[in-house]
Amino acid sequence: MAKVFVVGIGPGNYENMTVRADRALAECDVIVGYPVYVDLVKNRYPGKELVSTPMTQEARRCQMALELAKSGKTVALVCSGDSGVYGMAALVYALRGENSEPEVEVVPGLTAACSGGAVLGAPLTH
């Protein structure tokens, strides 16, 4: 049985994606996400199966990622910013329930708040 990486891809460009996120996306068989986020990464990771669902279909998207992993595929569920801050990580764990399968690995990303503060010259220090 494979796993689900819940991947925070940062605020929207490859330069702000973590090395760990890049590795998870390179390793996966399937990239699942909101269409805009899938579009942001698909050209960098050719040959991947791409699955997307529209806005308001977050639970369905997470369930699809879990089902794909249960079928033996390694899945990257992509989220903007950090996957644990208004991302899909909590929902994936909730939908998986108390089962230990499929394995879930949360890959944090750069939050939009931190990125925005840096761009504006106003880092979030106080």
State each model region's role:
Residues 1-107, 115:
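Class I S-adenosyl-L-methionine
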Residues 117-126:
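Short, glycine-/small-residue-rich phosphate/pyrophosphate-handling segment
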Residues 110:
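Active-site histidine-anchored catalytic micro-motif
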